[in-house]
């Protein structure tokens, strides 16, 4: 999800020291933009980049500059969000809830998105109709909220 719908289409930064990269000169103080969407959908980096395929991350062995949903590089030396782990954990919890604890239907929706809106997300958001809480979720809810009925 973070590759397909990055939080922002790009990130800005200022060059800290003069350098050359692939024939281009970057002067200290210059504002540069990191194209998150373009890098996360680049066909030289991603096989079938327009395909949503979470399995591509199972055994990730590529560079920390290839997958850049929240900046690139290592946390301690690069420009990667130090809170990225929190985003990943929240998404894991939500995906577990959706996959294991709720019965729902995904409503018809508009999955187009704007490259100027932050955060980047489908035009209609994510719409769903909750049909039922599965027993596992009901038991967990009852344990934490004794005395409250949930139907």
What are these regions (language model features)?
Residues 70-71, 102-117, 121-151:
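Long, compositionally biased intrinsically disordered regions
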Residues 5, 9, 98-106:
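A generic secondary-structure signal for well-formed alpha-helical elements
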Residues 45, 58-101, 110, 114-118:
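Cytochrome P450 heme-thiolate "Cys pocket" and heme-binding signature region
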Residues 35-62:
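Conserved cytochrome P450 K-helix/beta-meander segment immediately N-terminal to the heme-binding cysteine loop
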């Amino acid at each position: 999800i973070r590759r397909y719908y990055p939080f922002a289409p790009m990130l800005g930064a200022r060059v800290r020291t003069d350098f050359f990269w692939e024939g281009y000169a970057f002067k200290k103080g210059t504002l540069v933009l990191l194209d998150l969407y373009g890098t996360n959908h680049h066909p030289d980096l991603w096989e079938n980049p327009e395909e949503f395929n979470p399995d591509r991350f199972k055994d990730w062995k590529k560079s920390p500059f290839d997958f850049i949903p929240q900046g690139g590089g290592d946390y301690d030396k690069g420009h990667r969000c130090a809170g990225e782990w929190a985003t990943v954990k929240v998404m894991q919890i939500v995906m577990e809830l959706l996959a294991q604890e709720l019965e729902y239907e995904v409503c018809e929706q508009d999955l187009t998105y704007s490259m100027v809106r932050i955060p980047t997300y489908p035009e209609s958001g994510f719409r769903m109709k909750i049909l039922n809480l599965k027993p596992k979720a009901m038991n967990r809810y009852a344990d934490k909220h004794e005395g409250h009925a949930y139907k």
